[in-house]
Structures are given as structure tokens and as C-alpha cells.
Amino acid sequence: MTQFEGFTNLYQVSKTLRFELIPQGKTLKHIQEQGFIEEDKARNDHYKELKPIIDRIYKTYADQCLQLVQLDWENLSAAIDSYRKEKTEETRNALIEEQATYRNAIHDYFIGRTDNLTDAINKRHAEIYKGLFKAELFNGKVLKQLGTVTTTEHENALLRSFDKFTTYFSGFYENRKNVFSAEDISTAIPHRIVQDNFPKFKENCHIFTRLITAVPSLREHFENVKKAIGIFVSTSIEEVFSFPFYNQLLTQTQIDLYNQLLGGISREAGTEKIKGLNEVLNLAIQKNDETAHIIASLPHRFIPLFKQILSDRNTLSFILEEFKSDEEVIQSFCKYKTLLRNENVLETAEALFNELNSIDLTHIFISHKKLETISSALCDHWDTLRNALYERRISELTGKITKSAKEKVQRSLKHEDINLQEIISAAGKELSEAFKQKTSEILSHAHAALDQPLPTTLKKQEEKEILKSQLDSLLGLYHLLDWFAVDESNEVDPEFSARLTGIKLEMEPSLSFYNKARNYATKKPYSVEKFKLNFQMPTLASGWDVNKEKNNGAILFVKNGLYYLGIMPKQKGRYKALSFEPTEKTSEGFDKMYYDYFPDAAKMIPKCSTQLKAVTAHFQTHTTPILLSNNFIEPLEITKEIYDLNNPEKEPKKFQTAYAKKTGDQKGYREALCKWIDFTRDFLSKYTKTTSIDLSSLRPSSQYKDLGEYYAELNPLLYHISFQRIAEKEIMDAVETGKLYLFQIYNKDFAKGHHGKPNLHTLYWTGLFSPENLAKTSIKLNGQAELFYRPKSRMKRMAHRLGEKMLNKKLKDQKTPIPDTLYQELYDYVNHRLSHDLSDEARALLPNVITKEVSHEIIKDRRFTSDKFFFHVPITLNYQAANSPSKFNQRVNAYLKEHPETPIIGIDRGERNLIYITVIDSTGKILEQRSLNTIQQFDYQKKLDNREKERVAARQAWSVVGTIKDLKQGYLSQVIHEIVDLMIHYQAVVVLENLNFGFKSKRTGIAEKAVYQQFEKMLIDKLNCLVLKDYPAEKVGGVLNPYQLTDQFTSFAKMGTQSGFLFYVPAPYTSKIDPLTGFVDPFVWKTIKNHESRKHFLEGFDFLHYDVKTGDFILHFKMNRNLSFQRGLPGFMPAWDIVFEKNETQFDAKGTPFIAGKRIVPVIENHRFTGRYRDLYPANELIALLEEKGIVFRDGSNILPKLLENDDSHAIDTMVALIRSVLQMRNSNAATGEDYINSPVRDLNGVCFDSRFQNPEWPMDADANGAYHIALKGQLLLNHLKESKDLKLQNGISNQDWLAYIQELRN
């Protein structure tokens, strides 16, 4: 018995299996003759055509609701003011809460739940809102209820055509529900009203009040503008700029009118424009009189409101949904460039950025979301600005600087936008100059893009590059503008904000255009797009029940170990199930599946008995029993007592546990429970659909403690599959005459002569129909299956022809992949097609390539050269288990308490290694450690690195992009297989670093957050239902009894620190830590930034002396000194000796030499990292410094005072740099392949740890060190668990816990 044996059959898991369908006999001919494929293709096209029509309906409904909104906006205004006045967590949280209140209030109008409307209107809204996402949207009911939507006959026909096919819109529904959502979603109408437009309107009210207070005569000018435009005629100008009026500015129509008031109305050419308020103010300022000076001294530009969600921009109709030709791309871009020129967008942007020299930068804000992007662009490092701002805010704190205060500053930088003045003050004037240079450069490139001509086609690479270069330049300006896109709750300069909004609105299409043009230019020659098949049946394959075959039209067959799908099309316009005559099993034929299912007894039994309308009507006037005979093989009696049990006057029902708890009437509860269970059994024995079900395995009614326990045993019995043999001739005759469309359900495992392990989809599918599963259901076949069709791609046929040579993708070592950029060159060379000399890089690989003669024609991407049918079918695994797990983590934790010897697998996403794994036992001893760069003799790390470089180059050049997604997906699958094997082999838990705890994206491979999170999700999903292919089906771990080692996944946010046997620990201090002592570098080096701080830093050490015996230098310090330069690491040892190891030659276990104490440091030139590294020997450098300064050291005396006595800046700066390099434990250089850990402190045996010794009892390199300490953090987590009384992990691991634990363990 394995220790994990208790972790099976704990909860249900749903999966969708995917297969190809191969038409049999005359199936394809009949389908083509009936035109079903063309019909469903048209329906798929109509689906796309309908989306904007449906959006018009949604917009109409939104407008109708928004016209009724009446809210008091004072509380939201006050919350914004409080936050602007004092930006604290309290005021931010208060604002967030107030925004949520207003969003919910608007949402209530949509769903008919507001107190501001009558019951009748609320009821109407509730009904329409539900209908917007159901068949009522298509059958005309919603249109009739709305009354104001104008649709053409063609549009009405399109809508009606989906009356029975509404499932097409399931995903679209979810997306559009977000438009009406009260959640904080930027694409939701409530968000647009509350968080985008109200702050603008509020600012406009403030501007208006200040202007007419300072210059009362403006009131009349403003009123005249309103009259001239002819809007809001019954409302005074003061009312327009008051909060109650905002209720009238929620629809796009009203927003347009308001924006016309601010910006005026352009009329036909030759006709004077009707001026808006902003132009009136500009003209007033141009008079240069006293009034002009007053106006100019105040905020004097009103801010237009954003368009409402779902509103159209007709001016940009030339940007198509998808480009299909070179001409479409070029013509569209020409029109866009013309638009930008005509609107003087670039000139306006230039003027806007020039004005930053003369306005108050405390009211110009940078988005906190863009801080890292801006830092990379202006400072060459992503965290420079964040660090500078952090230091500035810390320096401004008064009193004791606590850990809590530091965390508060960190949170503020993470969640709050920052004004430009603070950024410049923190980072220095150099930043201001860098910003000016960057904006000038971006605008210059954008101007050049508008002036340059476009190519006439995009056939050649250089033509694509011309288009891309121009789009890059415009996109650069858009991204620059996006730096300033901030929450309007900031006290933003209204002038700047108004103009920025206008420019950004004009530049916004450049992003959409860029993506669509790039997708067109880089698309593959083949298409993976498929569309759904219905065969004129709206519910095709929605279920398999034998009684519903007529409606669902789908049946399954088995013959000689192969599986077939049958589709029964309409006959003469009518649905008709085929009637097959069963025959003897001994005769040749197909075994037809007969599927019986009575779903969810708790719901369906009452629905078919006590809750029937006739039963309810009977007991409203009678107390005598009623007999039901329709759908029953013999009459079912329902007594008044049984009826009342399920229809009590007051809840809870008497047979529910809630009744016993509420009343204490245990006896009455038990009697009612038994009576109801007896009734359900009586029902099932008489109901036509369920009479054949064997209920003999159920216990007597009195033995069930509650209804849930009873239904849990009953429901699995209500599902049953059986097979009957049908003569082959009968089936094939039906296929021949077109009454049955027959497809083989296919994947490569069903290919003739296939050998090897079947994939999981095959295992699930064959397991589903296995005798063991038919006898006791573990895998259930579900409804809602779908059929798809993918037309063949129109592409140039590429083939390896007979007599040619094929080139292996790997070299002779069967490990190293050939880079794609060299593969084609080598392939052409071995086939004598290369028109130039072989490159040096390719020639170096030539001796190690593997070639093979082509014995038959091999077509590239063959699967896309023919039409394909596909079948997606859902199943449920562990069908007899609960829908969801109960206290899964506590169950695991109880197991771990009983098995303290459980090993731990630590997993690190490395720097040089994609994934590194270390397995330790319960004492911390390393059992196994290895990199997963290479799996099954394939170097994924090199392949991914090559593919990433090729992909970047292709993206930059807009050439066809080689996919990296599939490569990463394949690698992740291999990694998970390796981890699972280790987990089962060692019966171990797995420990990962916590993504949500200060995650930093690394450079390549799978280290970026999205891919690493995908890896985690794949691992959780795999362990949700772990099937080991080699195991017998019913054995633990087999397909009918899979392991379940992780909890059901909901979201990473809700998961916390544990999912079953998968644990999460914070990443800090796992990689750059000494495994022998637990020492980590305690200093914050960015705080040591000038001569004074460096001198003060050195004064904080006790002594520095030369060890005569070892040739090392020893720097001693106590943790209670130098506190201002430390990270604040409680739990640290009180004192340490930092060792400058003698730089002498040592040898590893294989006799390979290395220099002790060597450090690898970045090469810095002109204050910037060059991307190169160099070797540094700190002890030798220190000796050279001391000899240069004439300081005697070989007597072992304290030399620190001598370094400090003359305030020699060179000596002090060099000494600080050497200390920093010595404390750098991790040393890596990709160019040389070095990556090691070398500790600067000795352990109890006097040894400075160095991974270069390659001792297998300790981490073998830097990434191994990370995985090892992640595993040790897991050990600490399990120790916490052992001390837990409630089997819960109350807290994670703090840095204090961790360092105290590891240092106590080692010292």
C-alpha cells in the first residue's frame, strides 16, 4: 500500500476530450449534398455579423436605464476630496468603498433592484436584463419590450436565425455582462460613469465656479454659448455645472451634447464654427487685458467626458475587424495618417509636452502602473525610479522608521499615482533632461512617419519593414501619452488632462491598427479556425439519453475496439430517431450505446411529483391522496403528508437537518426523513424512466443520517450505460441511404498498427466504456458535446520528396537542438540548394548533423491540407464522489502529521536553469538534485533560448513568427511529468515559491510570470486527477481510480499557501543564502550612495585584520551596529565574521581547478552596465590597496582605523566596493557558464561554502541552492503544521521565522 492510497475518489473532475472524426461510407457525400457545412459556415459568419447588432440592443437598454438614474453625487465628491487632501490608506480605502457603492447603485438600475424606481419599472428592467442573455434576445421579445431599437428586416432575420442556436453566444454573453457589471472593470458602464467621467465633471464644476466668481461677466458669455449651440435650453449654465446635472450626462447622446458645449460644433466648409466654452476662454485670454490675466491665472480649460461604453467611433470605420489583403492594410493606414495630419495631433502633442516646462508639475501625474516602464526607458533599469521614490519617502518620515512604515511606503508606490515633480526631485535633474530628450525623439519619429510614403504592396520583407517602422513611431507616441493616463481622483491639472485626453483619443487607434496589421503580415500560411456543426439540430449531441435521441440526434457505437459517432439528420424536415433491431452478440455488427440517466434526484424527483402543477392544484382544495399515472408504469400515490413534507408553510423542511437543529425535534426529523426516502424509492420503482434501475445496494431508509448521505449513494445509480449488438448491414444501409451519418472517433492511438502508450484522452475514453466502469461508474459520459469543421487551408504545398535528404532537428548527441535560423541553411546545403557559401555557424555544426534519405513523400503541415471534422465531448471523472472536496487541505495535513518522515521536493525557476529540483528528506538531507533544462535527452533550455531570439527577430521584422507557445507547452508537460514521477516515487510534498509574494519576472524561458503561473496551474490540474498510464485501470493511480493530490482550483488569489500536497513559500532569502550557516547579505546597498555614507558604513564595523595562518582577511561586525544600512532582519545571528578568502587555487571532486573567493561582477562604464562581467579577486585587491596606501597588515593588527584615518575617499570607496563584492554570494556569467554560490562566512568547521567543490550532499550550483532552500522552507512550513491544533496553516513564513530557523539549524 502506498502512503497516498487514501487520496483517491475525493471529488469530481470534469474534462473535455477532443478527437478527430473520420466520415464513413457515403457520410461525407450526403452531408455535402444536403449543404449542411455551407449552412453552418453561414451561421458562423452570421454570428460575427450579429455582434454589433446585439451591441446596439444592449446600448439601447443601457440608455433607457441611464436616463432614469437619479443619484446624489456629494458623497463620492467628498471621498475624492478627502483622498486628494491626504493620500493615506484610509482615504484610499474610503474612496474605493464609495466608488463601489455608486457602481452598485447604477448596476441596480440595470437589473431592476433600485429603490428609486417603481416596482413595475423594476420588474420590467429585471425581465429585460434576463432576456438580454437568453433566447428572448433573438425571438423578438426583447426588441418589443425595448420599443426604440430600429432594425432592418435583414437584421431581424439574422436574429431569428439564432432563436434555437443561442449557445453560440455563451462567451459573448459573459463578456457583455461585464459591460453592465458593478465590479471595478474598466470596460463596464458603471466604472466609466463613476471613476472616469465623474471626476472630470467634478473638476469642470470647480473650474466653472472659480471662473465666474473671479470674472462674473463670463456667466453671460457662457450662457450665450449654450444658447448658440442650442442645448440644455431649459437649464441655466449654473445648473449645468452642478452635481445634480451629472445624472443627465450618463448616455452617449448627452455626453456628446456636453462635449459640444465645451468644444463647440464644426459645421460645413466655409461656415464659421460654433464656438464652445474653451474657445470663448481662449479668445478672452488673447485680448491681453486685466480680465485676460485673471482668466489665465486660473484653470481655464474644461475637460471633455469620455465616450460611454459600447458607443461607436464612426470616423474610424476604415480600421477593419481583420485585414485580408495588402491593399486593405495600406489604404486604411493612409486614411489614418491623413486624419492625424488634418487634426494636427502631433503638433498639439508637441505643444502639450513643451508646456511641462512652465506648469506646476505637482499636478501632472504618472501612472503607478507605468513606473517600471518609464524607469526602463529613462534610467535603463526597471526599479531605479521606484527605489529613488522609496528612499525619498522614507527620508521624509519623522520619528522611528518602523517596518510597518516601510511597508506602507511600498504599498503607496504600488497603488498610488505619483506627481512628476516628486519623481524629478527623487531621481534628479538628469531625469528631467532624459524625459525631454525621449519626448523629442518620439515626436520626431512620429512626424517622420506621417511624412514618409507607404509601399504599394507588402509582399517583400523590406515593404513590411517600412510599414512597421511608421507604425512603431506612432505607437511610441501613444505609449508615451499612456504614461500620464491616471485615475481622475488625483488632483490633475485640468488643462493638461483635457488636452492629453483629446490627443490620446486620436492616437488610440494606432494600437489596434498595429496589432491587426502585424497579425496580417505575420500570419501562418495555414488556418486553425474551425466552426461549429449543427446539421440543423439546435441541441445536437446535447445529451445521450436513449429517450432524447430524437431531439439530440447523436448516438455512439463500438466495433472491434474502435468507436463511432452516429448523427441522425432530419428526415423530410422532421426529427426522427432511427429504430435499430438488436441482434446476437455473436454476429458481426456495431454495439450501440443505450444511455439512461435521471439527473440529480434531489431536484428531479420533486419536479416530477410533488411540485407538478396538477399536484399543487389538487392539494389546494383536497386532503385526499392523488394518483399520478402519466409517465408511470403503475400509479404513484402522493399523500397530503408527503406533499406537505416538501411544501411546508415555514422553512426548513422537516426532513432537513436544519429543522432538527432549529427545533430540537430529533424524533420528528427522523420520521420525516425515513418517510421522504421511502417515497423517493417508491417513485423510482414506478417512474417509467427509472424502473430498470437496480436500487438493491441502497441501505434501509432508517440507516441514513441525513438526506445528503442518501442522495450521494442514490445519484450514481441513476446513470447507466449498456450496449446492444446491431447488425452491420442495418447500420451501413442507414449510412448508404443518408439516414445515418457515421464517423469514426479517431486519434493516432486508434491508427492501424499503432504501438506505444495511449494518450490520456484515449485512456479516459476507453476507460469510460470498459466493463469495469460499466459495472461501477467512475467515469461518466456527459452531454453538451460539440462537432466542428475545419476547412483545408489554401496554402502552398511543401513536401520532402523521394530521394531528398531530411535533416534531424537534433545533433548527433540527440540532445542539442539545431537553431531554426541555421536549420534551413543546413537543410538547403545537404540537398545542394544553397546559393551561397555555408556560414561559419552552420559549418561548425555540419560534422554533427544527422541526415536521412526520404523514402516516401512527406507533406509539411499535412493536417491542414484537407478538410477535418472534430468531436469535443465532456466527461466527469470520479463520478461517485462529491462535486467538490470537503476540507481537502485539512485531510492532507492530518496525513502529514501522521507521516512526519514525508520527503519534500523544492522547485526553483532558475537563472541558468529553466526549472531546478531538489528532493530532501525530513531531516534536510539531499536525496536528489537536478536541472530540468534537458529532459529525455533534449535540451529545452537551448531550444527555448534560440526560439525566443528568433521570435523577437521575426516580430521586429514582421516576418512569419515561429510559435514558441507550443514549445513551452511541451516543455511544461515534460516538467510536470518529471515532478509527478518524483512525487509518487518519494511519496513527497512539492514546494514552490509564491508568485504573489514579491514575484520578479526573470529573463527567459518560462520565468515570466504568466508562463510560470501556467506551469503552476498545469501542475495543480494534473494532480487534481493523476492517472499513471502504466497502472491497471482499477489500481490506485489507474484511470478508474486516479490520485487526487491537490485541492479543487478556483483562483490563485483564493488558494493561499497550500493546495493539497502542493505548498507555497515566499521566495526571499532562498537563492542568495549560505546553506552551511544561513547567512544572507544584511545590507541595503542603495542607502550607501556618497562619501559620507560610505565612511559612516565602514565605521560601523568592529575590526578588519589579516589571518596569518590562513591568508584570509576577517571583517567582524555586530548586527546591532550599522542599523541605518541594514534591511532590518530580526532573527539574524548577533555577530558575524566576513571572510575575504585567500585567492588561491582549489580543486573540485573531479580535480578541476578554481580560484577560492573569486567574484564575478558587472562591468560598468559611464555609470551604466555594459552587459558584460569580469572576474574580481577581493583578497588580492585588498592587499593591493593596503600596499598602495602603505598600510602594514601582515602582523594581524586591526587595519580598519588606518583605512579611515586620513579620510581617503579612494581607500574608503574601494573598501566599501570590496565588502559588497565579498558579500555577493551568487556569482554568474552566462558567457563562461559559471553559476556558483560562495559564502563569505565560515561554518562551525571553519569552512566557507563553495558550490564549486561539487559535493552532492550540498547544493551543486546557484539554482540548486534556490531549490534546496525552497525545500527547507517547506520543511519549516510542515513544522508549523505539526504544531497546529486545527490542521490549518495559520500563517505563512516570515523572513524572521525563516532566518531564525535556518541559522539555528546550522549554528
Swiss-Prot record:
The entry's DNA-binding region: 599-607, 780-783, 951-968, 1051-1053
Region of interest (WED-III (OBD-III)), residue spans: 719-884
Site (Binds PAM on target DNA): T167, K548
Binding-site residues, crRNA: 47-51, 175-176, 307-310, 752-761, 806-808
Site (Binds crRNA) location in chain: R18, R192, H872
Misc note: Part of a type V-A CRISPR-Cas system.
Biological role: CRISPR (clustered regularly interspaced short palindromic repeat), is an adaptive immune system that provides protection against mobile genetic elements (viruses, transposable elements and conjugative plasmids). CRISPR clusters contain sequences complementary to antecedent mobile elements and target invading nucleic acids. CRISPR clusters are transcribed and processed into CRISPR RNA (crRNA).
Name of this chain's protein: CRISPR-associated endonuclease Cas12a
Organism: Acidaminococcus sp. (strain BV3L6)
